[in-house]
Amino acid sequence: VFQVFDKGTAYWTAEGGTHFVSGEIFKAYGQAGYERGSLGYPISDEYSTDSGRIQEFQGGVITSSTSGTYTLRYGTGIANAFREIGGVKVVGLPRTSETHSGKGVYQVFDNGTAYWTPQGGTHFVRAGIFNAYGSKGYERGFLGFPVSDEYSAGSGRAQEFEGGVIAWSAGAGTYVLRYGTGIANAYRDLGGARFLGVATTAETPSGKGVFQVFDKGTAYWSATSGSHFVRGEIFA
C-alpha cells in the first residue's frame, strides 16, 4: 500500500516494511513507473553517503548528488556489477548515466568506472590501474575494454583487457603490457599475472634486445630469438 503526504509518499509491504520516498529520488522513481515499474517497492529509507543520497528498491537503486539523479536497475550489467562489488560503499555514487562507446557502454562512479560489452560482461576499473588505462586512451585505445575484474597477482594487482594487461604493485608502480609485442605475448602464453606475477620494471634495452623483470622471472626478447622467460634455479 501507499499513502501520499505533502513532502513524500509512504510505501508499505509485508516483506520490506514502510519507507518514505521524496524529493529528487521520488521524481526519478515516478519516471521509472513508481511501485508498478521495474524498481518495485522501496526496501530502505533514503540515506546519506560521502557524495550524496541513495535509496534502495526491490529492483535497483536511485542515487542523487550534485552530479545528478541516476537509476540503476538490477538485471542490467552495470547495476548488477555495482551491487556485487559492494555498491556505494566501494565505488560511491554514479557521476554520469550509462554512455555508449563503440561496442559497449561505460558509467562513471565516484571511485571507478564500469565498462560493459556483450562479449566481456561488466568490469570496474579503479585507482592506479584506471589512471594507467586513461593514459592509453581508455576503451578507445589499444587496450580496448576490460575483460576481467582487478585481481591479486604476485606482489600486486592486475587487470586484463582486450589488448593487454595492466599490472600494479606498491613497490614497483604500474606497468602496461600490450599484446602484439614479444614480451607481452609470451607473458600471456605462459599464464600471465596469475602465473608470473606482476611486472616490477619496464622493458629495458640491453645489447641487441630488451628484458623485463616480473615477480617470478625475467623475460628477454631479441629480434633473432624472440621472447623467452628465465625463472627459478636457472635464473639464479
What are these regions (language model features)?
Residues 1-236:
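Extended, compositionally biased repeat/scaffold regions that form elongated interaction surfaces
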